[in-house]
A protein has these predicted regions:
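Glycine/proline-rich, flexible active-site/cofactor-binding loop segments
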Residues: 1-3, 7-9, 205, 225
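Short secondary-structure boundary/capping segments
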Residues: 17, 21, 65, 128-130, ...
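Short, solvent-exposed polar/charged micro-motifs at secondary-structure junctions
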Residues: 71, 126-130, 172, 181-182
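A generic structural signal for well-ordered coil/turn residues at beta-strand boundaries
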Residues: 55-58, 69-70, 75, 132-134, ...
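Donor/substrate-binding cores of folate-linked one-carbon enzymes
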Residues: 3-127
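An anion-binding loop in the catalytic cleft
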Residues: 140-237
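Acyl-group handling in specialized metabolite and lipid biosynthesis
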Residues: 129-142
Length: 237
């Protein structure tokens, strides 16, 4: 073979495999990485970009080396992150972009038998650590915007969640709501309407739009609230 291609591997390539790809007259191993390196090296760049509230991300085609996403970059392209973006939707957009970019890189190699690249910048290095299930539990004491970012980042895995009456409820969609002017407990239900369930947070409030109870289907938040008998003033854990 002429070149080895890896997509979203998230780990350090075994030395034995790396050495095979680096033999003479081969282009080495190329990685399609879902971030604008050196930001978000590591296993979960899409999740962490949304969780951090980044406005833009992208794809980098990089020449792999023995480090974790430390190799020189052959090409990169940006992609905006919308206010409603989830990891699921952004993953699909980046996958399409990455597919187009790797074809361009391989065509370039086929024509010229080389792939010019540039070393990554020293400044701006961040690491996208692996997502853990325990991160998904919502902390209502955080500000509404931060909670919304986490909900979108953890959709589809592991799914942001809270507890109510012993049941673990997953939150799939939400939006930042109005600023709470009077004093309320973090996690207190402020309103239930066809728009969703509005919950007080450490700063502002958040509107829960789509929820799922254990063993159930994803349904609108107001439907679940009615089915489970939630009331304004109840506090979510």
């Amino acid at each position: 073979f002429d070149v080895m291609v890896v997509a979203a591997y998230g780990l350090i390539l075994p030395k034995e495999v790396f050495e095979i790809a680096e033999k003479p007259n081969r282009a080495g191993c190329l990685n399609i990485h879902a971030s604008l390196l050196p930001r978000w090296r590591g296993a979960a760049p899409i999740h962490r970009a949304i969780e951090a509230g980044d406005d833009v991300t992208g794809v980098a085609i990089m020449q792999m080396d023995l480090g974790l996403d430390t190799g020189p970059v052959i090409s990169s392209k940006q992609l905006a992150i919308s206010e409603k973006e989830t990891t699921a939707s952004l993953h699909d957009s980046l996958a399409t972009l990455g597919g187009e970019m790797i074809v361009e890189a391989l065509n370039e190699y086929d024509r010229h038998k080389e792939l010019p690249s540039n070393a990554q910048e020293v400044d701006g290095i961040t690491y996208a650590k692996k997502i853990l299930k325990e991160e998904a539990k919502i902390n209502w004491a955080l500000e509404a915007k931060t909670i919304d970012q986490k909900i979108r980042a953890f959709n589809p895995f592991p799914g942001a969640s809270f507890e109510k009456a012993g049941a673990i409820i997953k939150v799939w969609f939400s939006s930042v709501s109005s600023v709470v002017k009077s004093k309320h407990l973090s996690g207190e239900i402020l309103n239930i309407s066809r728009l969703g369930v509005e919950v007080a947070t450490g700063s502002g409030s958040i509107l829960l739009v789509e929820l799922q109870k254990p063993g159930g289907k994803k349904i609108s938040a107001d439907q679940l609230a009615q089915a489970m008998g939630w009331q304004v003033g109840d506090v979510l854990n």
